[in-house]
Amino acid sequence: MLVLASASPRRREILSRFIRDFHVVPSNAEERCSGTPEECAVELARLKAREVYSRVGGTVIGADTVVSIDGRVLGKPSDEGEAYRMLKLLSGRVHRVTTGYCIIHEGKEIAGSATTEVKFRELDDELIWAYIRTGEPMDKAGAYGIQGKAGLFVEWIRGDYYNVVGFPMEIIWKLRELGFEVLSR
């Protein structure tokens, strides 16, 4: 039994493109950590995977995505003002999106991370506030979702697009190495 330890509809949708049979069991783990963005993402993924594994067993995938700029981690905005400040900070600059993952398979943990660089165009206040009014940024690390309207903001990316969405292809490859069938319908 393959279990995705996430409430994210984006992670569920990406995984379903490659693997047909899996269950979704959101984690109840508390999301707090310290360290580098990479360490933080992996640690949060581990906490999620372990918490769900303790309840349901099977093969469990935990993932957590963080956006960072100047070494500072940008989580999900708590309100519109914080979303504005995050987007203003990202405007015209390169930032990093890191997804940590932890797969617990037969009691063993396989953990790692993927990082993608993203460059935003210069964003004026009118555009930032129009985007915030869509409601899209409020449940996303760094206050944006590349797969939605904020795709307009992106000048370029270097790395895995799916990582920026929250589920890097590295996870699919790890699952394949563990014997899970991918691309079957």
Curated annotation (Swiss-Prot):
It catalyses: dTTP + H2O = dTMP + diphosphate + H(+); UTP + H2O = UMP + diphosphate + H(+). It holds the Pfam family Maf. Its EC number is 3.6.1.9. GO terms for cellular component: cytoplasm. The record marks 10, 65, 147 as: Important for substrate specificity. One of its GO terms (molecular function) is UTP diphosphatase activity. Keywords: Cytoplasm, Hydrolase, Nucleotide metabolism. GO terms for biological process: nucleotide metabolic process. Its main location: cytoplasm. It is an enzyme of class 3 (hydrolase). Its cofactor is a divalent metal cation. The active site is at residue 64. It is found in: Cytoplasm. Nucleoside triphosphate pyrophosphatase that hydrolyzes dTTP and UTP. May have a dual role in cell division arrest and in preventing the incorporation of modified nucleotides into cellular nucleic acids. Belongs to the Maf family. YhdE subfamily. This is dTTP/UTP pyrophosphatase. It comes from Thermococcus gammatolerans (strain DSM 15229 / JCM 11827 / EJ3). The lineage of its organism: Archaea, Methanobacteriati, Methanobacteriota, Thermococci, Thermococcales.
